[in-house]
């Protein structure tokens, strides 16, 4: 076992995971280095290669395994960790007594949407206490657009007896700035929802490491 890999673990136990640098967290995940490259050095090299933790996590299998020192085993483990994080955030929403934590919602949506290379339009369907009933990817599109049909959203909302909605879609370009069509689409969905006494609580636009909230800007 390498002494370098013990240091981050000891730091985590003493001060908490939040005190660790990204490369230290990755070193704990990797556990060991390779010949002539201790695990700390390896983790730093991995992050430089992929640019960030987000770049590492969003890499596909081929991209991930191209880096010497990490392979299919680490790829599988990382995908499992990422999926567990998504499900944890989903459970946080599902089991919350009331939907009062916009930060949890935003982190969940960023985790779900920002890695897509095509535009995906998702909807969170909430009950009358603003607890999550389900999340559904309603529409998928191209690199810069997705066709969205308010009628389909409302039909699904009525089917699952939702009282409120949170809308979200990603911008693969990386910018979270809403377009004119995003604004118009939101108004159309909100108008259709109001006819059925369903509230639209927010619309998140997810970019690369950034987001835009219609509710935060009082656009709803």
UniProtKB/Swiss-Prot annotation:
Q: Which residues bind Zn(2+)?
A: 169, 171, 182
List where the motif JAMM motif lies: 169-182
Known Pfam families for this protein?
RadC, UPF0758_N
Which positions fall inside the MPN domain? 98-220
Q: Which residues form a coiled coil?
A: none
Does the record bear Heme in its keywords? no
UniProt GO molecular function: metal ion binding; metallopeptidase activity
Biological processes, Gene Ontology terms: proteolysis
UniProtKB keywords: Hydrolase, Metal-binding, Metalloprotease, Protease, Zinc
User: By its UniProt entry, which InterPro entries does this protein fall under?
Assistant: MPN, RadC_JAB, RuvA_2-like, UPF0758, UPF0758_CS, UPF0758_N
Superkingdom of origin organism:
Bacteria
Would you identify the family this protein belongs to, as annotated?
Belongs to the UPF0758 family.
State the NCBIfam families in the record: PRK00024.1, radc
Descriptive protein name? UPF0758 protein Asuc_0013
* Lineage summary: Bacteria, Pseudomonadati, Pseudomonadota, Gammaproteobacteria, Pasteurellales
